[in-house]
From Swiss-Prot:
Localization per record: Cell inner membrane
Name of this chain's protein: ATP synthase subunit beta
Primary localisation category: membrane
Species: Citrifermentans bemidjiense (strain ATCC BAA-1014 / DSM 16622 / JCM 12645 / Bem) (Geobacter bemidjiensis)
Binding residues for ATP: 157-164
UniProt xrefs under SMART domains: AAA
Gene3D superfamilies named in the record: 2.40.10.170, Bovine Mitochondrial F1-atpase, Atp Synthase Beta Chain, Chain D, domain 3, P-loop containing nucleotide triphosphate hydrolases
InterPro entries in the cross-refs: AAA+_ATPase, ATP-synt_VA_C, ATP_synth_F1_bsu, ATPase_a/bsu_AS, ATPase_alpha/beta_chains, ATPase_F1/V1/A1_a/bsu_N, ATPase_F1/V1/A1_a/bsu_N_sf, ATPase_F1/V1/A1_a/bsu_nucl-bd
Gene behind this protein: atpD
Domain of life of the native organism: Bacteria
Length: 470
């Protein structure tokens, strides 16, 4: 097949119009390449993806890297296929960019197998319907909003409440305990955090079981809008061809939407609510429907979701909500109390918080914990106006237990050891259930509430109380 060439007719930021000869237009999602001397001295080093057909034998494309240095009339080569990334075991331990090139200066991937980044979601008949919980070792999550194996989990939170730290702790806990392969997509987040994660994984010895795909804040919107799809293709290969249970971490899914909205305006689409792209729900659906479990293997995904201005009704987080099996909501009020992870125990939900999945004992304790915390929340207005003395004896007891529960929901993290100075704790589910059932039963009413702060198991809280008493 003879090579198809076109030429640049217009450059508008990250969007480039290319003219072709009549009858030779590349289809939507096809990859094109052009030489940009501002990137490096390689030929055809900039990848474009066809987004629209404009008529007049022209296509509108989105650039995957910087367009500074491009000029009208430059030659563009049609690659004859969509953007493809290397897949398979050679990607493990490596950092790739959106087009599957290594960016860790450790030489080429040297892989023969590639997957396109736009793929169909698995058919209904091939999807798995098995439901089981998996343990993360984080008390508040395992007790109140447990994660499903092969499910989709969202970590919601505003700026600076600890989403990335929680994701890094989950990688640390699950990747070490789980033993399978992990894929991490860094979508429009800080490059420093990406670097920290790489170093962290290297030190803890889980790097050789993980593939990292980065398109960070400094990348153009085209790369940020596609990098999650590149990572997903790598995860799909492990699920479909190797029958693995894969973990997919995405930090941050909001940046995927944000990049889509940046590009959408340049493509000439009329914006919808709050200035987002009109195709918001479709784009989110195309990504999320591919993250699923089949009868060959599973993809369990944990996605950090930035909440603009702490408003959960913003279209970006609200659209993501519909796809999730469990939501872990991080709250600024709880972070201000110094309780980390700052998970809101009343706002966080899980589809599998159900006695048929997690058992009667776990379900009963979780509901009692939520009841006590809700009662405390309801009493806070009275306490603020009249003080604790005006409460009945029964309510005073509820408040005391609620404050202990609140403190006991905190936990020292392995990845934060350098900042907190206290060693991280992984708490088994049975220990979590035992601890909270004892607090609710009133076995530890005599201990000071400070004893429950930043400990793992209830035994550690008792030990801490003895030290405090000295």
């Amino acid at each position: 097949m003879s090579q198809n060439f076109g030429k640049i007719s217009q450059v508008i930021g990250a969007v480039i119009d290319v003219e072709f000869e009549p009858g030779k237009l590349p289809p939507i999602y096809q990859a094109l390449r052009v030489t940009n001397p501002a990137i490096d001295d390689q030929e055809f080093n900039l990848v474009l993806e066809v987004a629209q057909h404009l008529g007049e034998n022209a296509v509108r494309t989105i650039a995957m890297d910087s367009t500074d240095g491009l000029v009208r009339g430059q030659q563009v080569k049609d690659m004859g296929k969509q953007i493809s990334v290397p897949v398979g075991k050679k990607t493990l331990g490596r950092i790739l960019n959106v087009i599957g090139e290594p960016v860790d200066e450790m030489g080429p991937i040297g892989n023969e197998k590639e997957y396109g980044i736009h793929r169909e979601a698995p058919l209904f008949v091939n999807q798995s319907t098995k439901v089981e919980a998996f343990t993360t070792g984080i008390k508040v999550v395992d007790l109140l909003a447990p994660y499903a194996r092969g499910g989709k989990i969202g970590l919601f939170g505003g700026a600076g409440v600890g989403k990335t730290v929680l994701i890094m702790e989950l990688i640390n806990n699950i990747a070490k305990q789980h033993g399978g392969f992990s894929v991490f997509a860094g979508v429009g987040e800080r490059t420093r955090e990406g670097n920290d994660l790489w170093m962290e994984m290297k030190e803890s010895g889980v790097l050789d079981k993980a593939a990292l795909v980065y398109g960070q804040m400094n990348e153009p919107p085209g790369a940020r809008a596609r990098v999650a799809l590149s990572a997903l293709s790598i995860a799909e290969y492990f699920r479909d061809e190797e029958g693995q249970d894969v973990l997919l971490f995405v930090d941050n899914i909001f940046r995927f939407t944000q990049a889509g909205s940046e590009v959408s305006a340049l493509l000439g689409r009329i914006p919808s609510a709050v200035g987002y792209q009109p195709t918001l729900a479709t784009e989110m659906g195309e990504l999320q429907e591919r993250i699923t479990s089949t009868n060959k293997g599973s993809i369990t995904s944990v996605q950090a979701i930035y909440v603009p201005a702490d408003d959960l009704t913003d279209p970006a987080p609200a659209t993501a909500f519909a796809h999730l099996d469990a939501t872990t909501v991080l709250s600024r009020q709880i972070a201000e109390l110094g309780i980390y992870p700052a998970v809101d125990p009343l706002d966080s939900t899980s589809r599998i918080l159900d006695p048929q999945v997690i058992g009667d004992e776990h379900y009963a304790i979780a509901r009692q914990v939520q009841y006590v915390l809700q009662k405390y929340k309801d009493l806070q207005d009275i306490i603020a106006i009249l003080g604790m003395d005006e409460l009945s004896e029964e309510d005073k007891l509820v408040v005391a237990r609620a404050r202990k529960i609140q403190k006991f929901l905190s936990q020292p993290f392995h990845v934060a050891e350098a900042f907190t100075g206290s060693p991280g704790k992984y708490v088994e589910l049975k220990d979590t259930i035992k601890g909270f059932s004892e607090i609710i039963a009133g076995k530890h009413d005599d201990l000071p509430e400070q004893a429950f702060y930043m400990v793992g198991t209830i035994e550690e809280a008792i030990e801490k109380a003895q030290k405090l008493a000295v």
